[in-house]
């Protein structure tokens, strides 16, 4: 984003009940089931959801205790937790078809460590990390507030309150912010479309949604009343997988930085941490966030690249966007590689990724989340190397 002048920037989010997010949730549910049984299981699970039908497909390598029957039960529990018990999509009677097979031996031989050969990357690719000072979470403000609006609406829906009972699981948000010299100063428009029951009126929904927006946005940031769009097309009763088919991995911009930073193209959900699409994107965020937390720069974009079967990154690139505080970017790249082993194994061990921690990542963004110390999740959001970075640059 530009550092000078005035401009508008927009990001969107979708709720856990959006069809694509239902698919992401189920794929990560399968992943967590395998990692719970075997921390070194291999999983690449894709999910399709549509009217009363769920299809799982992909490749796995793990213990026989993870049976199709177990995965079907976990799939139904995930759908129930999201809140779907509707005629067109219900946890009780949706058809669940499971088509998972063994991981390709050709892929496994490139990834597995043998003898003196360290574990290789599960595929080639480029991954990006980003951090900035726009929010306390060091995330871009438009995506941060888009997520928060939907998270609050979901909390309300699941609260059992009178207002919450009017809401159904499928929802989307979109926040447009005005920037002055690279800093957000207020919202110019907010769009929220939320699925609802037949009994809900548009006036009631508007009151509920506007109240949540007011709770989420900073003081003085509310857009004009006429620029708050709630269910702009009117009725939104039929939603979720009954309204639109959903697929794993179709919300990669929602999952990351809302378009404020580049994206390498790889999705996250359903992939075990040997897949650098996921693990390297996590460590890239971790490194970028620690640079900003160390006050070495106000905005950081970081790129890492890998080749399948190769244990070290082919490149590490850091861009401080002119916001560095007397920091040499080449030295910073070298320092980051010294502080964190960026091999696939090194990333997994540093961030403790071989655990069943992925279901919570499947909605409301993989980044900008608050780590739960009891669960030891979202470890890539910790800023535990910021002090070492400051020391390396004599701060």
UniProtKB/Swiss-Prot annotation:
Positions of K(+) binding: 46
Top-level taxon of origin: Bacteria
GO biological process, one term: one-carbon metabolic process
Annotated spans, Flexible loop: 103-113
A GO MF term: methionine adenosyltransferase activity
ATP-binding listed as a keyword: yes
Pathway in which this enzyme or protein is active: Amino-acid biosynthesis; S-adenosyl-L-methionine biosynthesis; S-adenosyl-L-methionine from L-methionine: step 1/1
Key words, A-Z: ATP-binding, Cytoplasm, Magnesium, Metal-binding, Nucleotide-binding, One-carbon metabolism, Potassium, Transferase
Annotated InterPro entries: ADOMET_SYNTHASE_CS (IPR022631), S-AdoMet_synt_C (IPR022630), S-AdoMet_synt_central (IPR022629), S-AdoMet_synt_N (IPR022628), S-AdoMet_synthetase (IPR002133), S-AdoMet_synthetase_sfam (IPR022636)
Binding of ATP, residues: 18, 170-172, 235-236, 244, 250-251, 267, 271
Compartments reported by the entry: Cytoplasm
Reaction(s) catalysed by this chain's protein: L-methionine + ATP + H2O = S-adenosyl-L-methionine + phosphate + diphosphate
Function: Catalyzes the formation of S-adenosylmethionine (AdoMet) from methionine and ATP. The overall synthetic reaction is composed of two sequential steps, AdoMet formation and the subsequent tripolyphosphate hydrolysis which occurs prior to release of AdoMet from the enzyme.
Protein's UniProt name: S-adenosylmethionine synthase
Annotated organism of origin: Granulibacter bethesdensis (strain ATCC BAA-1260 / CGDNIH1)
Lineage: Bacteria, Pseudomonadati, Pseudomonadota, Alphaproteobacteria, Acetobacterales
